A protein has these predicted regions:
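Glycine-rich, N-terminal phosphate-binding loop of Rossmann-like dinucleotide-binding domains
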Residues: 5-6, 84, 163
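Predominantly a Rossmann-like dinucleotide-binding segment in NAD(P)-dependent oxidoreductases
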Residues: 58-131
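Beta-loop-alpha module in the N-terminal Rossmann-like domain of NAD(P)-dependent dehydrogenases
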Residues: 1-44
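Structural detector of well-ordered beta-strand residues that form the stable sheet scaffold
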Residues: 26, 51-53, 81, 134, ...
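Rossmann-fold dehydrogenase core element
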Residues: 40-57, 76-79
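Contiguous beta-strand/loop segments that form the cofactor/metal-binding neighborhood of enzyme cores
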Residues: 119-167
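A short helix->loop->beta-strand "cap" motif at the edges of active sites that frequently abuts
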Residues: 21-23, 48-51, 157-158
């Protein structure tokens, strides 16, 4: 088995190559840059009879399982709020002109792909797919998002997700 923790834009190519050689793959989040890459990765896993797994650790945490198990005991939930914000030490270098992969569009960087995915994965895992999604972001000079907000609506409920690499 191999563990892939390279920039997101390289995940599909590297994972598919490994799976074609019969290796199981544990791939860091975000799994792929887009749906087409993810589908190609899933096909490669199936075609080569190997396991492809995204390293989304929080959904395997015992606390997450406990929340999921007991969520219905809370009664009707009308408001959901999720946040993953951390000031990236690489943001200081970015402001000085150094572009690392987390802030590079060609590497599929940005706050949503790096930390916002934790909010999205948790929301869908706990509450299912929303009916509607709207979003806004703070764009950086490279075209990626430094921070953002997602609003997801469910019948009788609304979820807000905030994520950031710059605050």
């Amino acid at each position: 088995a191999v563990y892939i923790a390279s920039p997101i834009a390289l995940h599909a190519m590297q994972a598919i190559k490994m799976m074609m050689h019969g290796k199981h793959v544990l791939c860091e989040k975000s799994l792929a840059s887009n749906l087409a890459e993810a589908e190609a990765m899933f096909r490669a896993a199936e075609d080569n009879n190997v396991i492809l797994m995204e390293a989304m650790r929080p959904i395997h945490d015992p606390g997450y399982a406990l929340i999921k198990k007991n969520l219905k005991k809370l009664g009707r939930i009308r408001k959901i709020y999720l946040n993953f914000s951390e000031y990236s030490r690489r943001y200081n270098a970015f402001k000085e002109g150094e572009i690392t992969s987390v802030f590079a569009r060609e590497m599929s960087g940005g706050a949503l792909m790096d930390v916002g995915v934790y909010c999205v994965e948790s929301l869908i895992g706990l509450f299912g797919m929303p009916e509607k999604i709207t979003s806004a972001m703070i764009p950086l000079k490279t075209g990626v998002d430094g921070a953002g907000k997602i609003i997801a609506t469910y019948p009788g409920a609304i979820a807000e997700m905030d994520y950031s690499k710059i605050t």
